Structure formats: structure tokens, C-alpha cells
Amino acid sequence: RQSSHCRNGTERCAEAVENARLDSDLIINFQGDAPLTPPWFVENLIHAMGEDDKSSMATPVVRLDRVTYGHFLQDRKKGLVGGTTAVFGVDKYALYFSKEVIPFVDMEKLSAESDIPVFHHVGVYAYRPDALSSYVEWPIGELERLEGLEQLRFLENNQLVKCVSVSAQGRVFWELNNPDDVDRIEKVIEASL
């Protein structure tokens, strides 16, 4: 049973690990708002953390295709806050996460065959146990408070967050962030039956 003082999924995960007295090299936090997450996203996280001992945590990102990019922009124009985007450097360490669609893309400067340089952050996390236990000791920072994104607490405390680029391999991927998302997700699930 979780206590009521946990403010987000990462704090709940840390509390569960502490209560269960788990001794593990890696903790995976699979959150309920991403029911379409395929298993290889988690496998890729585990592999990436095994190869990079500098990262405090890792999270998957999916490059948006033009259709999904359009959905993200339409949602924002409607005032809906949903899909989180991630920006990262050449080393794949996160620079920022936002509920805005970042980076801005001037489509007139992007050739028709170019990939959109926007990545959807998937709400699944792999943590090193020491980083997870430190997380609950850090205060909520200004960026986390403003964006409402728990992973920003790691960045605000100078922790390396690895963005692991994953492919949906032809599957439709969408998270549950707004009431309209329920219908989208249910249609994907129905089509897969």
C-alpha cells in the first residue's frame, strides 16, 4: 500500500522499493498511462543501462512521424496537454523534457524526405537504486513544478538521464493523457485482437 505523501510515480516507485526491501541493480517503473508500451521498450532500457554506468536513469523516446507530429501539434492548438517530448544531445543524454512540442520545427526548411527531429518521451523509467533513493530527498524544482514532469527533478539535480531511442516497429503508440486518448487507445487495442 502506498502512502498519500507520494506526489508522482517515481516517488511511489521509490517507496515501494524501500518497503519491499528490494536489492537490485536496476528498478523499472512501468506507469499505467502507457498501456500500448511494447515489451522491447523495457528490454532496450535494460540493455542501455547495462552499457552506460554513468546514467542515473533511462527512459525510452520514439521519433515522431509526420502524422503523429501533426496530432501533437493539433492537441496543443486545442489546449490539450499530453504527449511529452524530449530533447537530447549526441550522447543521448537528456537536455530537456516538455509538455510543449519541442524542438520547434520550421517545416518549410525540412525536406520532404527528412525525419522530424521531435521525440515522444514514453512514461517508462529504469533507475539505478541509489539515484531513485536520492530522488525522494531532492526538493521539487522550478522546472518540475512548472511542467509537471517528474523526470525533470533528475535534470535539475545534475543527474544524467539517458534517452533510449526505440521503434514502435509498426505498432501505433499513444499514451493516456487526455479523455480523447481513451478512444484512440481502445481502437488500437480492438484492432489488435
Model-predicted regions and their roles:
Residues S4, S24, T37, D52-T59, ...:
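Structured catalytic cores of enzymes that bind and process phosphorylated ligands/cofactors
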Residues R1-H47:
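Short phosphate-binding loop-to-helix
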Residues L22, F97, S111-L193:
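Conserved alpha/beta core of the MobA/IspD/sugar-nucleotide pyrophosphorylase nucleotidyltransferase superfamily
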Residues Q2-S4, G32, F88, K99, ...:
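Active-site donor-binding loop signature of nucleotide-sugar glycosyltransferases
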